[in-house]
Regions:
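Juxta-kinase regulatory segment immediately upstream of eukaryotic protein kinase catalytic domains
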Residues: 2-5, 36-156
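ATP-binding glycine-rich loop module of kinase domains
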Residues: 146-207, 211-214
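Conserved structural core of kinase catalytic domains
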Residues: 215-264
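Activation segment signature within eukaryotic-like protein kinase domains
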Residues: 269-270
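Catalytic-loop of the protein kinase fold
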Residues: 280-299
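C-lobe/activation-segment region of protein kinase-like
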Residues: 303-305, 310-419
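Conserved C-terminal C-lobe helix
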Residues: 423-437
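A conserved short helix/loop substructure at the end of the activation segment
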Residues: 436-449
Length: 481
């Protein structure tokens, strides 16, 4: 019996823990509730350990999270066969509560959650999702969320998981959205994640097409009301699964092999990153905000595709320092002398540290004060400079081969070029350093950056000493029990 438990979460009350498990074509949500009358029961011990509560006795919790997960997994395996035969087990509003009776024997019961109705009613039908704005609905079809077989979760906000359709060809897709489990976890968090999900769908649909930017989804995952299934409500989208993973996956693969990624590939990928961001600013007239190696996936031809258009947070390890919410910007005219001696006025970005009351417009992400929308409308030059910095950090991580896990928890990222990067040409290092200049006015322009990489990628690599072949490996999907 192959049962996977790859997602465990709590709720706002800190009195319940949920676990999503799957086997073959069946995916179930299990519930563990705190029972004050049976503090040593499995469910109470799971809750106490998950929330790091302080019970009266050590027998009312587990020694650590690993022991808790093992006990939880074992309990799911013990009741799975019985649960799977229940006639209502596949209903979308069902959860399975696992508990112990007075004799400490495993018991389970099916619950049809009344909250499921609230979950569905909080979602939008496709027609309402595209009622206004620049987003345009292309040809599409829908898939019932309950028909999706969970293969493994990919992390990130909301629910992002590798799935396949139970009635389809078996091909893998990536589901990105908000499922019922998200609603059970936190109502407030769900509302935010739902808004972000819909914002991303609309944003991608409004972008002019570009070969290195993800195309609008043409498959929507939907749910229906239990009592009336005539109308479908959007809970997410399906995108093709990219088996080569992300740019960060390619770098992480080299950590085990000790190999250097081919220079030609690095040049092409740097060009494609710059091209996608230039299109974002100068053609689509918007921004990305979350530029990092993990948000560039590789398609079947090893070309980069920019994903994650939530525009609701930025990673601190690629975020431009002036865009961290502590600075305001304005443009000022300054005198400049040309080569012929004539004076002229040029525009310069002037930054001033904010000294007012605490401000916050990004409650669920970081930085807490998001300057991107305001700068996009009133100071686009400052926004472009900030995203050039993020591109520079991302390019450095690729060229130096630094995995995100090496920098994502650091208070400060120090850019360096080690002996391992001796294969990187000096002019490549120099252009990255120009992206990272502390003064945004001195950073290389985005179009100049694009032109640099276009020339590099078009060079004759025939006599190059580097291996010109694709050296990354396919993504190995890891599902934690």
């Amino acid at each position: 019996m192959d049962i996977g438990v790859d997602l465990i979460w709590g709720d706002d009350s800190e009195s319940e823990v949920f676990a999503q498990a799957q086997s073959k074509d069946l995916s179930l949500i299990f519930r563990y509730s705190l029972n004050l009358k049976l503090p040593q029961s499995l469910s109470s011990r799971v809750v106490n350990c998950y929330y790091n509560l302080s019970p009266k006795d050590a027998s009312e919790t587990f020694s650590d999270r690993a022991a808790m997960r093992e006990a939880l997994y074992s309990s799911v395996c013990r009741v799975w066969d019985q649960c799977a035969m229940h006639p209502s087990i596949s209903a979308p509003d069902v959860t399975v509560e696992i508990y112990e009776d007075a004799e400490r024997q495993d018991q389970w019961r099916i619950s049809h959650e009344s909250l499921y109705k609230q979950y569905v009613e909080s979602l939008l039908p496709i027609s309402s999702l595209f009622q206004s704005g620049e987003a345009k609905l292309q040809a599409y079809y829908t898939v019932d969320y309950s028909s999706l077989v969970q293969i493994g979760h990919l992390g990130g906000r909301g629910r992002t998981a590798v799935v396949r359709c139970s009635s389809g060809s078996g091909s893998l897709h990536v589901f990105k959205g908000v499922d019922f489990g998200t609603f059970l976890e936190s109502r407030a968090d769900f509302e935010h994640r739902k808004d972000v999900c819909y914002h991303e769908i609309r944003t991608i649909s409004s972008l002019p097409r570009h070969p290195n930017i993800i195309h609008p989804a043409d498959v929507f995952a939907t749910v229906q009301k239990i009592e009336d299934d005539r109308q479908a409500f959007v809970c997410g989208t399906l995108y093709p699964f990219m088996e080569h993973g992300t740019l960060d996956d390619q770098v992480k693969n080299t950590k085990t092999t000790g190999a250097r990624l081919a220079l030609r590939n690095k040049a092409i990928w740097c060009f494609q990153m710059a091209s996608a961001i230039a299109h974002t600013h100068f053609t689509a007239h918007t921004f990305h905000m979350d530029i990092k190696p993990a948000n560039f996936v590789l398609d079947s031809n090893q070309n980069l595709i920019l994903i994650d258009w939530e525009q609701s947070g930025a990673p601190l390890y690629t975020l431009a320092p002036e865009a961290n919410g502590s600075w305001d910007v304005k443009e000022a005219k300054v005198e400049s002398s040309s080569s012929d001696g004539a004076d002229s006025a040029v525009s310069k970005l002037v930054y001033e540290r904010y000294a007012g009351h605490y401000r916050e417009n990004l409650a669920w992400g970081r930085p807490k004060w998001n300057v991107y929308p305001f700068w996009s409308e009133f100071y686009p030059r400052a926004l472009v400079a900030a995203e050039v910095f993020s591109l520079g950090r991302t390019m450095w991580m690729l060229l130096q081969q630094v995995a995100q896990s090496e920098v994502e928890d650091l208070d400060e990222v120090v850019v360096y070029w080690s002996e391992d990067a001796r294969d990187i040409p000096d002019d490549w290092k120099a252009v990255v350093d120009r992206c990272l200049d502390p003064d945004p006015n001195k950073r290389i322009g985005l179009m100049d950056l694009l032109n640099f990489w276009e020339k590099v990628k078009c060079k004759d690599w025939t006599n190059s000493m580097c291996n010109p072949d694709f050296s990354g490996r396919s993504l190995s999907l890891r599902v934690a029990a």
